[in-house]
Every structure is written in structure tokens, then in C-alpha cells.
């Protein structure tokens, strides 16, 4: 390997040592599409199981210190769930990251959320983000 290639490789390797990825909580649950769900025996079904799985991924990779949450799927009681989430963060050593609102599932979002033709729906979506 030529010196410049070696230096480029070392630079890339060093950058990867500090690279971090936020993993989505829903990546540990059953998955699917609008056409159906793909059920997996080991899929996480609670937020604690998701934190446990995220902790294992972070332990193996060292590059996933945060997990994005979904407001309806992970925080069904809204802000009342936050103390329990903080406990899970401490227990599993993974922090919460982005809190994603549900701006896609309901019928009102058939034509989008922030770009919906309805001013009322766009306004509601803006309040959620």
C-alpha cells in the first residue's frame, strides 16, 4: 500500500473510531410495511426490551450510544413516561435520542404532514415537531 493510501486509510479508521449512529427503537420490534407485519420471535415488545437490545448493540459496536424513540410506540403516556425512560437509560447505559412524532400513520396524513394541502393539518404537524 502506498504511503498516501496508508495515510488515507488511517484517517478513515480514526474517523470511524469516533463515528456514532443513533439507532431507532422500532428497529428492535416487529417490522413490516403498510401491507403487513413481519413477526419475529425475538422482537422487543416493550420499551425496556428495546433499551436492553440497544445496550447490547452498543456494547458490541461502541458506536450506538443513543436510541431514537417514537412518541406513540414508546411513550404512550406522553411526558408521564419520562421518569421510567430515564431509569432505563441509567440501567442500560444508552441515552434517548430524537423523539419522533407520529406524522404519518393517521388518515389525515394521506397527503403528507408538513406539505399537506390542508393548512389545518400543516399547522397541527408544525405543533408536533
Predicted regions mapped to residue ranges:
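N-terminal pre-domain/capping segments
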Residues: 1-128
Amino acid at each position: 500500500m502506498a504511503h498516501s493510501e496508508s495515510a488515507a486509510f488511517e484517517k478513515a479508521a480514526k474517523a470511524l473510531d469516533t463515528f456514532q449512529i443513533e439507532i431507532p427503537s422500532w428497529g428492535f420490534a416487529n417490522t413490516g410495511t403498510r401491507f403487513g407485519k413481519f413477526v419475529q420471535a425475538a422482537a422487543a415488545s416493550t420499551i425496556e426490551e428495546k433499551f436492553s437490545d440497544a445496550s447490547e448493540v452498543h456494547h458490541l459496536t461502541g458506536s450506538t450510544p443513543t436510541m431514537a424513540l417514537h412518541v406513540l410506540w414508546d411513550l404512550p403516556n406522553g411526558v408521564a413516561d419520562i421518569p421510567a425512560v430515564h431509569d432505563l437509560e441509567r440501567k442500560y447505559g444508552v441515552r434517548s435520542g430524537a423523539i419522533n412524532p407520529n406524522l404519518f400513520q393517521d388518515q389525515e396524513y394521506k397527503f403528507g404532514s408538513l406539505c399537506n394541502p390542508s393548512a389545518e393539518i400543516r399547522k397541527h404537524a408544525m405543533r408536533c415537531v
